[in-house]
């Protein structure tokens, strides 16, 4: 890919994107030397315009950006690198440098990221940490309880209750997945496969009494 990138025109903008959540993490710049170092070490290195030198992201904080894949845009003058961040990306301690929201829309992947960060935090009053410490049986029980609440709300035709309880179900599902070390991306892959697969009808299901 480096043969396709024309570094003779100056620094090339580089966008870092979380490999699992697709969150945009930061914007930096590379010269050819920084790019080659990134390829070799599999950790993102920029060319710092303020320091006027190569700068490996995380060299001071330890919050390295581990390369998962590298993509070049159609004009071959910008790079997208999907990474697994080792800690917060922003120097402020935030997960992303893009925190000044002009307009935002919640994405389900953000829930997984929030749970992941809560699990690593030292907050003694964290409900997420409490569930993870209690273990998979406790988490599974809570997930089942919340799912049953959705059923009750649906039977009562209580729209608001169904919405609220569904949110609780999603939260406990993501805690369960985290506890089992299952990234949501693997669930998405199964859904994508089923969506693309034709003639996926499996026939009539047996009634519960016949199972």
Curated annotation (Swiss-Prot):
GO molecular function, one term: ATP binding
Assigned EC number: 3.5.4.19, 3.6.1.31
Main location: cytoplasm
Chain segments carrying region Phosphoribosyl-AMP cyclohydrolase: 1-107
A GO CC term attached to the entry: cytoplasm
Localization, UniProt: Cytoplasm
Catalytic reactions of this protein: 1-(5-phospho-beta-D-ribosyl)-ATP + H2O = 1-(5-phospho-beta-D-ribosyl)-5'-AMP + diphosphate + H(+); 1-(5-phospho-beta-D-ribosyl)-5'-AMP + H2O = 1-(5-phospho-beta-D-ribosyl)-5-[(5-phospho-beta-D-ribosylamino)methylideneamino]imidazole-4-carboxamide
Gene3D superfamilies: MazG-like, Phosphoribosyl-AMP cyclohydrolase
Record InterPro entries: His_synth_HisIE (IPR023019), HisE (IPR008179), PRib-ATP_PPHydrolase-like (IPR021130), PRib_AMP_CycHydrolase_dom (IPR002496), PRib_AMP_CycHydrolase_sf (IPR038019)
Pfam families: PRA-CH (PF01502), PRA-PH (PF01503)
Region (Phosphoribosyl-ATP pyrophosphohydrolase): 108-211
Pathway involvement of the protein, from the record: Amino-acid biosynthesis; L-histidine biosynthesis; L-histidine from 5-phospho-alpha-D-ribose 1-diphosphate: step 2/9; Amino-acid biosynthesis; L-histidine biosynthesis; L-histidine from 5-phospho-alpha-D-ribose 1-diphosphate: step 3/9
Keywords: Amino-acid biosynthesis, ATP-binding, Cytoplasm, Histidine biosynthesis, Hydrolase, Multifunctional enzyme, Nucleotide-binding
CDD domains on file: NTP-PPase_HisIE_like
Enzyme class: hydrolase
GO biological-process terms attached to the record: L-histidine biosynthetic process
Family, similarity comment: In the N-terminal section; belongs to the PRA-CH family.
Name under which the protein is recorded: Histidine biosynthesis bifunctional protein HisIE
Taxon lineage: Bacteria, Bacillati, Bacillota, Bacilli, Bacillales
The encoding gene: hisI
């Amino acid at each position: 890919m480096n043969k396709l990138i024309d570094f003779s025109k100056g620094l090339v903008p580089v966008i870092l994107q979380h490999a699992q959540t697709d969150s945009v993490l930061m914007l930096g710049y590379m010269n050819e030397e920084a790019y080659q170092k990134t390829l070799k070490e599999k950790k993102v290195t920029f060319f710092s315009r303020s320091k006027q030198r190569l700068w490996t992201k995380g060299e001071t904080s330890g919050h390295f950006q581990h390369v998962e894949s590298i993509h070049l845009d159609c004009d071959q003058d910008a790079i997208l690198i999907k990474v697994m961040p080792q800690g917060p990306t922003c120097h402020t301690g935030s997960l992303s440098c893009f925190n000044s929201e002009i307009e935002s829309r919640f994405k389900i992947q953000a829930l997984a990221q929030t749970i992941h960060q809560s699990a690593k935090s030292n907050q003694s009053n964290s409900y997420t940490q409490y569930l993870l410490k209690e273990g998979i049986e406790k988490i599974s029980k809570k997930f089942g309880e919340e799912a049953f609440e959705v059923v009750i709300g649906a039977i009562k035709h209580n729209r608001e209750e169904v919405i609220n309880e569904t949110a609780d179900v999603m939260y406990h599902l993501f805690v369960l997945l985290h506890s089992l070390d299952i990234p949501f991306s693997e669930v998405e892959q199964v859904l994508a496969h089923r969506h693309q697969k034709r003639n996926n009808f499996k026939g009539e299901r047996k009634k519960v009494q016949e199972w």
